[in-house]
């Protein structure tokens, strides 16, 4: 899992499963990878059950939890996370030295430096559906693989993801939009922004 092997990032997400073998796999990747690692969905569930593995790594680590996953990571309730989203994200990112994307309305992006915090204003409730978080994690992985610094990659991915959701909602309605339609709108936005 070394950058010199041509691997530019690793993403562990939905479908990974949570069992003895995948716990071992995630632990080994965190210990050995020199490229950025993105944990989402099952990757986060594994980390929540074995939280110390987050400190035993050498590569940049980015986590993209929703409030329920964040509650599992912190050992509290989702209501407690929602009551202080910026504080929870900031504390966790600083304690574990990670870049954290706390998904939800006004997604919070926190870096390991206490001063590194962004609150995103793009996005809408129509994005709260299966596959939307996978699109975000894929965007984040793409930007990280291109060498963008983790906090900047997270902020850019979250902003563009939300903007694509806003454009999709405008064209198809919040009820009619899908992550696939968001991805199509993202392609148009990237072309418009020159990316």
Predicted regions and their residues:
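Short, small-residue alpha-helix embedded
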Residues: 71-72, 129-160
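Glycine-rich phosphate/dinucleotide-binding loop and adjoining beta-alpha-beta core of small-molecule
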Residues: 15-122
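Feature representing long, continuous alpha-helical segments
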Residues: 87-90, 118, 137-138, 151, ...
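N-terminal loops that bind phosphate or other acidic moieties
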Residues: 53, 114-115, 140, 147-148, ...
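Short, charged, surface-exposed loops that flank catalytic or proteolytic processing sites
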Residues: 78-85, 147-155, 173-177
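Charged C-terminal helix
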Residues: 163-195
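Short beta-alpha connecting loops at secondary-structure transitions
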Residues: 73-74, 120-127, 137, 141, ...
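Single conserved hydrophobic/aromatic residue that forms the stacking wall/gate
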Residues: 1-15
């Amino acid at each position: 899992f070394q950058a010199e092997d041509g691997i530019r990032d690793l993403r562990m997400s939905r479908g990974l499963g949570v069992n003895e073998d995948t716990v071992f796999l995630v632990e080994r990747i965190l210990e050995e990878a020199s490229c950025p690692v993105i944990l989402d969905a099952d990757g986060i569930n594994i980390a929540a059950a074995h939280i110390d593995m987050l400190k035993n790594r050498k590569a940049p680590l980015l986590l993209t939890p929703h409030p329920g996953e964040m509650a599992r990571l912190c050992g509290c309730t989702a209501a407690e996370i929602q009551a202080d989203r910026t504080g929870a994200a900031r504390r966790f990112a600083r304690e574990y030295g990670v870049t954290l994307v706390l998904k939800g309305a006004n997604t919070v992006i926190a870096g390991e430096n206490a001063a590194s915090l962004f609150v995103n204003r793009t996005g809408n409730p129509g994005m709260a559906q299966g596959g939307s978080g996978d699109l975000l994690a894929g965007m984040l992985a793409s930007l990280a693989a291109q060498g963008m610094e983790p906090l900047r990659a997270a902020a850019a991915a979250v902003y563009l993801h939300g903007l694509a959701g806003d454009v999709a909602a405008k064209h198809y309605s919040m009820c009619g939009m899908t992550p696939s339609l968001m991805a199509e709108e993202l392609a148009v936005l990237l072309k418009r922004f020159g990316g």
